[in-house]
UniProtKB/Swiss-Prot annotation:
DNA ligase that catalyzes the formation of phosphodiester linkages between 5'-phosphoryl and 3'-hydroxyl groups in double-stranded DNA using NAD as a coenzyme and as the energy source for the reaction. It is essential for DNA replication and repair of damaged DNA. Belongs to the NAD-dependent DNA ligase family. LigA subfamily. GO terms for biological process: DNA repair; DNA replication. NAD(+) binds at D32, S33, E34, Y35, D36, S81, L82, E114, R137, E174, K291, K315. This is DNA ligase. NCBIfam families: dnlj (TIGR00575), PRK07956.1 (NF005932). PANTHER family: CHROMOSOME TRANSMISSION FIDELITY FACTOR 18, DNA LIGASE. InterPro entries: BRCT_dom, BRCT_dom_sf, DisA/LigA_HHH, DNA_ligase, DNA_ligase_AS, DNA_ligase_CS, DNAligase_adenylation, DNAligase_N. The gene is ligA. Its cofactor is Mg(2+); Mn(2+). It catalyses: NAD(+) + (deoxyribonucleotide)n-3'-hydroxyl + 5'-phospho-(deoxyribonucleotide)m = (deoxyribonucleotide)n+m + AMP + beta-nicotinamide D-nucleotide. It comes from Haemophilus influenzae (strain ATCC 51907 / DSM 11121 / KW20 / Rd).
Amino acid sequence: MTNIQTQLDNLRKTLRQYEYEYHVLDNPSVPDSEYDRLFHQLKALELEHPEFLTSDSPTQRVGAKPLSGFSQIRHEIPMLSLDNAFSDAEFNAFVKRIEDRLILLPKPLTFCCEPKLDGLAVSILYVNGELTQAATRGDGTTGEDITANIRTIRNVPLQLLTDNPPARLEVRGEVFMPHAGFERLNKYALEHNEKTFANPRNAAAGSLRQLDPNITSKRPLVLNAYGIGIAEGVDLPTTHYARLQWLKSIGIPVNPEIRLCNGADEVLGFYRDIQNKRSSLGYDIDGTVLKINDIALQNELGFISKAPRWAIAYKFPAQEELTLLNDVEFQVGRTGAITPVAKLEPVFVAGVTVSNATLHNGDEIERLNIAIGDTVVIRRAGDVIPQIIGVLHERRPDNAKPIIFPTNCPVCDSQIIRIEGEAVARCTGGLFCAAQRKEALKHFVSRKAMDIDGVGGKLIEQLVDRELIHTPADLFKLDLTTLTRLERMGAKSAENALNSLENAKSTTLARFIFALGIREVGEATALNLANHFKTLDALKDANLEELQQVPDVGEVVANRIFIFWREAHNVAVVEDLIAQGVHWETVEVKEASENLFKDKTVVLTGTLTQMGRNEAKALLQQLGAKVSGSVSSKTDFVIAGDAAGSKLAKAQELNITVLTEEEFLAQITR
């Protein structure tokens, strides 16, 4: 072997290891820049020496020519579907059938429990460790050849990470698109006047069935393996869970939520845990898959028709349902944004009754081609506001009415305008508009802003409706007599509200900036502004160039801030707030070079009382830390707020330094 071949082999081996750490272990040992440097070095060497190019090189994920169509692949072992359960009773009946069928019944039965990913099932064949073929599930017997497209997925290894690969190994898994990637994909499509996808599953399906793999390579797809088909030249572990861990050890990604459960009660506990975590996972699931863990027991139980007896999918309540669109109302937000809200025939979706859904903006109404009277597909996922994702146009009644976007504000009758390049139309009424005034005041008192506990949305609505307050400063001028005259406001409640207002006068500069409600200035940006300028006067006097020196403040946000301080009304409100006693201490954050967190990996868990999670994350990043979402042996610190859960427990198990919120704040300030 020549020196060049040895160098190429070493580069490929190193890059495969880094890909494994990044995509499978979620624990990279080097920064992205180092991977990129080695990748480009390998690519340059391969261009200089094409005679040594191999098909399993990390550089060869993309390169196949577009296909004229997909050829068919017959599955040597059929890819079966699963029976479904929709209630605890149906799951318990499944367990009873297993217990009745087994000759020697282990006590308790052990299950391998997995999230049921909402993607596309695929089969990937490795021959002597090299990816040679991939197919869709199809009808279970025959699928489409998607080898070129599967090769483009970054977490799918082109070469297994083992020196002793099986002669043939068929990996079965689910390809899906995480939420973050889906949002980026649709954002790009909107910016380039391309068609958007209705949901991540459709996006994943459309991406896998591209005839041009170069297009697929630009789509943020992910594989999670859930089983093994063909296995030749290897002694596989004797349990399903151990097989998944073995796959992980040779470079195949598996889902991190997989758990072993003993007995039906533990399995049902897993089902509820995953259901509660569903909205925070970052990808779509529609239930759990529950499998007998022991392979010998699986073989004993066998199959019925097209499903195994040893596994079942326990589905979550439906997240999508059909209903009728009865009307559309237009609501006004604190920045004047006009949002169309669909008034629906009430329908039970994902555990709750839904009667309203957002239609986002005029473009969305046009895209959906929706009319009052239509039958619509409503989707509700976790805590996300229900939305209409489709229309059954073939069911449109003759008396359907078009949705007319208003030209004047439905609250104050001011003109509605839409700035070129923006999707949102806005009322021009400003604080003259009662709706904007209410929402601006609700934002001002919210937990992440001034955190005024005793003053809620309903109280603000009464105060605005009765013309008792017009600006945030007016809140601090309220007295007991005024408050006790309001509906449902007794003396005790009024005293609590006044005490909350008094306590809120002592705040932080970051919270105060966020509370002002400047467009596109979220809590993280407010924190960056406070840390950069140190004082309100310095921020107020900053020019556009100075504003753009703040992290995460670009030209658009800088303009918003600059214009805010050039409005005499805004300056007057701020001065009035200061006059009413609103104040803060000047806290200097330590420079990145002199703090405990520089170049460290930090995990946040629990509820922080002094700042929001995003605020803390932005602060840590400014200090030079890497903020991770999961605890591992590479974690340096865990900052634990109230009600910290499994991350705190894992940190203690791994002897990782745990800081309270107070200890964290003491470390970063002086």
